[in-house]
Regions:
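A charged, aromatic-enriched C-terminal amphipathic alpha-helix characteristic of glycosyltransferases
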Residues: 12-16, 252, 256, 273-294
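Conserved donor-binding/catalytic core segment of Leloir-type glycosyltransferases
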Residues: 115-132, 137-140, 151
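Acidic donor-binding loop of glycosyltransferase active sites
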Residues: 200-214, 227
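Short hydrophobic beta-strand element within catalytic cores of glycosyltransferases
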Residues: 228-231, 238
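Short beta-strand->alpha-helix junction loop in the catalytic core
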Residues: 86, 103-113, 156-159
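A short, active-site helix/loop in glycosyltransferases that binds the activated sugar's phosphate group
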Residues: 77-100
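Nucleotide-activated donor-binding/catalytic signature segment of Leloir-type glycosyltransferases, i.e.
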Residues: 164-193
Length: 294
């Protein structure tokens, strides 16, 4: 049977979900199904098949625009959203029919727990730079804490060479700043398997997100690996990380956001090894690994 074609040069969250779906579902599941990832394009419709659009994008992306066209939506049999939040936003923005919509949350492969280093606190930021890296770096520098390091796994090459050629230059200065900042380890792009190995050693996923995440696989993986998540409540982050995450209110005034985030991060660092927090993280690991599973 024909299978949907994966985007070979992109290793973003959506594409990795796609690859895992192909891994876990047998070939016969795709019989008569045309599965379209993240692109509401007339050209991708196959009229003799069941057309399923798997939507990880937010409503502000150009690939979502055709969901406002009745002509296009009529050609779809199903629209699968990766969170209730994303579904609600599409209903609000495009009036997509609820009868054709379904929410299936993202999934990860089980992450085995390893005891974490008690002599230092390791923070990690392992998502694209435009989601809040500038603000995190500023907060981290200002906190200037002993025995705390920040590990940055962020790049534009994750979405392929073409994307990197167009967008990469814009983020060169922030990546250079990471390389030249005390107690910051800059890894650039790491394949997902290496990220998971690193997460097992990390204590806190520091994610002052200014981007409306529609799910946030990096947060799911972090929680499964026993990391505290300190993030904003923007987009679907609250849905994905509740009740375990530590949230600050998103604020368009970035000075306010940084102040608030700095307090929350400092508190989480200070209290990481408290009995109460360790009990919470144990429950978090078990819950996330079982609820976000394939």
């Amino acid at each position: 049977h024909s299978r949907p074609v994966s985007f070979k040069d992109s290793c973003g969250g959506s594409e990795n979900q796609f690859r895992l779906l192909l891994k876990y579902l047998p070939d016969e599941s795709f019989k008569d199904v045309n599965l379209i990832l993240n692109n509401a394009s007339h050209d991708l419709i196959e009229k003799d098949k069941i057309n399923v659009l798997w939507m990880h994008h937010f409503v502000n992306q150009k690939e979502a625009e055709n969901l406002g066209s009745k002509d296009f939506v009529d050609k779809l049999d199903w629209i699968v959203f990766n969170s209730n939040w994303n579904f609600e936003k599409h209903v609000y923005q495009f009036k997509v029919p609820e009868t054709k919509s379904i929410v299936i949350r993202n999934a990860i492969e089980k992450i085995n727990f390893e005891e974490k280093n008690k002599n230092k606190i390791s923070l990690i930021y392992h998502t694209t730079p435009w989601r809040g890296l500038v603000h995190l770096l500023k907060v981290f520098k200002n906190l200037n804490l002993e025995n705390v390091e920040l590990n940055v796994c962020s790049s534009t090459i994750i979405y392929g060479k073409k994307f990197d050629d167009i967008v990469g230059k814009k983020y060169k200065s922030i990546f250079d700043e990471c390389k030249n900042t005390k107690n910051v380890n800059y890894y650039g792009y790491l394949e997902n398997k290496k990220i998971i190995d690193l997460l097992k050693k990390m204590h806190i996923f520091a994610h002052p997100s200014i981007w409306p995440e529609t799910s946030c696989i990096s947060a799911i993986e972090s929680m499964a690996a026993g990391c505290e998540v300190v993030s904003t409540n923007l987009g679907a982050l609250y849905e994905t990380c509740s009740p375990f995450g530590t949230f600050v209110n998103f604020d368009r005034n970035f000075d306010n956001l940084e102040k608030r985030y700095s307090k929350a991060l400092a508190y989480s660092i200070k209290n990481f090894w408290s009995d109460e927090n360790q009990n919470k993280l144990k429950l978090q690991r078990e819950t996330i690994n079982s609820t976000y599973s394939w």
